[in-house]
């Protein structure tokens, strides 16, 4: 992203829009934390699941993954963390310190009080049915606006 800004400046382009997008992207983890605290002011001991560790779906690329800052912020608040990604398994990454890596979406959400969707994997669209089948109603924070708020008892979406 930094390279894109430099390239744009080299070509004489106004980079204010790209800079604004970058500022918004960097503020997303704090926004997610803010939405969680709206429902649970203290996150100490909260069971939080982060879904999606890859930078984007259908890849195992974790470079600049938006999940890592989210995990760090929740860890700083004392949350008990679980994460799942269908392909990416970054067990050695610093951001995964103290995070339980689940084997499936079901294992990841079964005991969660808060579920944060970070990457748009198609299988995460099955959450409403999964929650219904298991009689679960965690707070769902949809960081990608791919889920319908009407499908969840407690829903927060970035930009909604």
What are these language model-derived features?
Residues 1-160:
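Structural/interface elements that position substrates and couple domains in central-metabolism enzymes
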